Amino acid sequence: MGAAHSASEEVRELEGKTGFSSDQIEQLHRRFKQLSGDQPTIRKENFNNVPDLELNPIRSKIVRAFFDNRNLRKGPSGLADEINFEDFLTIMSYFRPIDTTMDEEQVELSRKEKLRFLFHMYDSDSDGRITLEEYRNVVEELLSGNPHIEKESARSIADGAMMEAASVCMGQMEPDQVYEGITFEDFLKIWQGIDIETKMHVRFLNMETMALCH
Amino acid sequence: MFLLLPFDSLIVNLLGISLTVLFTLLLVFIIVPAIFGVSFGIRKLYMKTLLKIFAWATLRMERGAKEKNHQLYKPYTNGIIAKDPTSLEEEIKEIRRSGSSKALDNTPEFELSDIFYFCRKGMETIMDDEVTKRFSAEELESWNLLSRTNYNFQYISLRLTVLWGLGVLIRYCFLLPLRIALAFTGISLLVVGTTVVGYLPNGRFKEFMSKHVHLMCYRICVRALTAIITYHDRENRPRNGGICVANHTSPIDVIILASDGYYAMVGQVHGGLMGVIQRAMVKACPHVWFERSEVKDRHLVHFIVSCILGTCINNTSVMMFKKGSFEIGATVYPVAIKYDPQFGDAFWNSSKYGMVTYLLRMMTSWAIVCSVWYLPPMTREADEDAVQFANRVKSAIARQGGLVDLLWDGGLKREKVKDTFKEEQQKLYSKMIVGNHKDRSRS
């Protein structure tokens, strides 16, 4: 537990960068150490230690999101091999609840960031578009493991949803016009006016008397 | 050279005398009472003294903290996330409803938004996971002079450090060798005793001898750990032909229960020293030792009573018992065991410590204090199946011990989550979507 002077400075720096409070950072740091086995970095394998995560059908996409360079703001594509605590917090910060004290511009920015995180989850080849293949891939993963749904049904569901998205984004299409994929602007358009902020955040408990030993 | 000689013999003499004294003390105060099942009350006195010392130590720390105007670090064990108990269906319906700017009759079968739910759930489990939390040791509020449980190092004054140093000295140099000697005596007596009894012809005498050999050795082991046990409701003690079921925090549970009653045990085969002990015990009494994965042995025995084991879990929750123990139609005597972590943490995190390290930790703590509650017997009713009965027993035990009831099976720690659970989630989700799909095609 950091009682040294430099540690609290680090915490303050992280507070500024990621927007978490110092209590939350301390809690997340303990969690980070638990996941990494007291190492300074986490690799993909460390997420196998979270048994509850196994239940999640899109587990691999979530884990991948942690190492995605676009989410880590380290590059336009590719995956990192391991992440440190600051990277961990950066990813977690996408799920911070909307602060009531934020002004409209900040709310808009936060919302865009959250949607971008989601977009990256769909767009696995980092080409900036969600193609039909990528969409199908997500639907199949969500529906995988159920023996009653054949691949065909999963596909048709994906195709149907993709057509919906196309109609929203491009309006009426010519018969030979090909819809290449959903770009981020289209993605934003789909979500215009719909309140996603309340669904894309983790609710932290109010922690009392959690003073650190400074 | 010559000058050294008298000193030499003096030292040797002193050593000899102190060893003899030690052994006599050992014999008189510990082993003899163990054989006859009486107690001098030394351990209770010891416990009271320790409590007074701990209270003083915590007071000093709080005073130190107040001087510096800070608060002591009180670890928050209840998790950091407010998890909403809504189900998968409700949440997804809500998400879709909030997106109802689309045409009302044109409910899409699958929306990009569905991924929100799983995304958030995934993040929440990464941040704070119910099952993993259960597996780390409980954290204390007052300090018990063991450095392993202290998070407030900077508030220790000089006096406290001296006290702590003294504590270390006592624990490692006096208590530890004493306990090891006792344990050694106890175990070797057990092995030798049961082997000898095994050679006797089957009959009442053999049973009588076996019972007493077992009891005696367990009592010695109990003293080897300085386990201070309080038994409640002894009138409900398991009787012949019943099955004793208890919550399992550590291998010490077996010793604690077995020192108060004669049980035939059902348990997992271990290697090494435990294996030797197990094999010896089998000679005198019909215990059943099985491989964890094989469960067919369970209906073997003419059980006298058997202890049921599960995975070691932290003291605060009771995991689902292995279903197998409840399928034989006998009377079940539930027993709740609760450890007081103030004197020594009995929790064994098997992935972190091996057996020997664990035992050493136990033997260098102050004492193991626990309470054992014998609950009234239960039988399976006609309309319950094994699982429901198991849950009923489990909640009775949890209620008594003040432990938190948790539906998870402790086996999670070792194996990966069974695929059936994962499929359940996905089935539920896909049912929702395919349901919609079918409705549309019908209309």
From Swiss-Prot, chain A:
Pfam families: EF-hand_6. Gene3D superfamilies: EF-hand. The keyword Lyase does not apply. Ca(2+) binds at residues 123, 125, 127, 129, 134. InterPro entries: CHP3, EF-hand-dom_pair, EF_Hand_1_Ca_BS, EF_hand_dom. Monomer. Homodimer; disulfide-linked. Interacts with SLC9A1/NHE1; the interaction enables an optimal Na(+)/H(+) exchange activity. This is Calcineurin B homologous protein 3. It comes from Homo sapiens. The gene is TESC.
